From Swiss-Prot:
Cross-link 3-hydroxypyridine-2,5-dicarboxylic acid (Ser-Ser) (with C-46) per UniProt, renumbered positions: S38-S47
Species this protein is from: Streptomyces actuosus
Recorded superkingdom: Bacteria
Role played: Inhibits bacterial protein biosynthesis by binding to ribosomes. Specifically, binds to the complex of 23S rRNA and ribosomal protein L11 (RPLK) in the 50S ribosomal subunit. While allowing a weak binding of elongation factor G (EF-G) to the ribosome and subsequent GTP-hydrolysis, probably impairs conformational changes in both the ribosome and EF-G which are necessary for translocation.
InterPro entries named in the record: Thiopep_bacteriocin_prcur (IPR023895)
Protein name listed in UniProt: Nosiheptide precursor
Cross-linked residues, 2-(cystein-S-ylcarbonyl)-3-methyl-4-(glutam-5-yloxy)methylindole (Glu-Cys): E43-C45
GO MF term (any one): large ribosomal subunit rRNA binding
Family, per entry: Belongs to the thiocillin family.
Cross-linked sites for Thiazole-4-carboxylic acid (Thr-Cys): T41-C42
Position of the Thiazole-4-carboxylic acid (Glu-Cys) cross-link: E43-C44
Crosslink position(s): Thiazole-4-carboxylic acid (Ser-Cys): S38-C39, S47-C48
Length: 50
C-alpha cells in the first residue's frame, strides 16, 4: 500500500511541476508582449527587462 501511495505522489508531483513549467512559459510570453508594447511609451520598462 505504501509503495503504491508513494508512486501516486511522485506522478502527481511530476504533473504539478509540468503544469507550473507550462504556466511559467505562458506568463513569460505575456510579460514579453506587455514589455514590448510598453517600450513605445516607457523607456524605463525596457531597461528593467534587459
Amino acid at each position: 500500500m505504501d509503495a503504491a501511495h508513494l508512486s501516486d505522489l511522485d506522478i502527481d508531483a511530476l504533473e504539478i511541476s509540468e503544469f507550473l513549467d507550462e504556466s511559467r512559459l505562458e506568463d513569460s510570453e505575456v510579460v514579453a508582449k506587455v514589455m514590448s508594447a510598453s517600450c513605445t511609451t516607457c523607456e524605463c520598462c525596457c531597461s528593467c527587462s534587459s
